From Swiss-Prot:
The keyword NAD does not apply. tRNA splicing endonuclease is a heterotetramer composed of SEN2, SEN15, SEN34 and SEN54. Interacts directly with SEN2. The keyword Disulfide bond does not apply. One of its GO terms (molecular function) is tRNA-intron endonuclease activity. Belongs to the SEN54 family. It holds the Pfam family tRNA_int_end_N2. The gene is SEN54. InterPro entries: tRNA_splic_suSen54 (IPR024337), tRNA_splic_suSen54_N (IPR024336). This is tRNA-splicing endonuclease subunit SEN54. Residues 434-447 have a biased composition (Polar residues).
Amino acid sequence: MTEAEELSVALGLHDSDAEEDALAQDWSEMAKLVKKANQHALPRRGEKDYEPDGTDAQALLLHTAKETMFGTLLNSVRGSTVKTLIKAYWEEEQRMARIPNARGSFTNTMGKVDKHGQCWLQLHEFVYLVERGTVSPYLALTVGDEKSNHEDVLLSVQDVYALFSSTEELDEFLVYAHLKRLGFIVVSTDNPPAHVTSFYPPLSQKSSASSNWFCHIHSWLKTPQNLFHVPLYHPLHFLLHRYTSSPQLYEELSQHIPFKKVPHDINELREERNNGILNPNVKQWKIAFNVWKPKSSFKKKTPGLPDFQVVVYNKDNAGQQFPTYDEFRSIFHRLDYRFDFLNELDVDDSAWDDYTYTDGMPTREFMQRNKIAPSQPHSGGDSRKKKARTYPQHIAQIRRLKSGFKSFILSVIDDGLVSFVRIAESDFGSSNIWYTPPSQTGTTNNRTRSDKVDV
């Protein structure tokens, strides 16, 4: 044996060359390991496939992904189990939906339960739950004279939408569904709770008559002042009054411009409510919904004052016109919610119980009589409460003029699109926004601006 043959035998080259043709290299196991290691890792760099490149590899991957998706949808079990099925029967006479055995979290904020344990839903609540798939809509038909013999007729979504009897009901449903999808708690004013809470004390007929007499006497006492009042532009006025500065002129001019005095505190709010008289010739816009912010302590029977109140306006309805000034005044007069401009009450939920009335009595007394737990303040103690930010006088005045006092939400529907506009009651008449020079008693170098603020 030569030296070359001995070297090849030692290295094993002769056997490997012979087996190379018979055995093929198998990379499948290695590919599985690599695929398993990288199946959760996404490429962080490099170009991504965001458009077709015409290759067979990409077409195969896309076909495989589609087949997997459609196969999952096709082979999935459809329908609902009998245990979780909630049937809602539409009662045309009451124009409400009845759920014999209501269960689910929606019962915390929707519907009313009667003494038989049945939950009754308003039309907009019924349609909203049908859209979500929470309830299955049925129409109960009485067969024969026996009331207990019913035949269930399943309704489609088109049938449910056909239950609306007017465009106003459909508009209110659009607003209701939009607010519910945003997470708010929405209750229609047509369906008041069992115990109604109001910011205003109950007004008896005797006190109402006395307040009307007070208004007449007050207007009669102001008559001599109006008779002997000299207009500003009359020459006789400057013989009786002397003006030595520009602020005095502005002050006098502001008294000659008519404006509506806006209530700023609790007493002014209640005084305006008691003394105000609604004009019967003015259209009374409906306050459609009371809205609460999402909270776990909400109770349907005693919800308390709402956080917002909503008025619905359909721009496409030829029978509706945008509210006029008098109609806005009527809406502001009927508002009853948590007025956010009352700083003395903007502490926690329990503070409002001392200033509200439930079923004609103070809320504290009502809760003690019915053994209802009071509203708990926010956890964290006084040390964790967020301190109110203070602003300079002129900045605070601008913020107050911008935000206003009483306000409501005007929901505008335009071609099925719902928009929300906040309409606020501002007070430009009693806010002096002109420049007032600094006093002479200060330092000589004091040339800072001093704004007079009455808000």
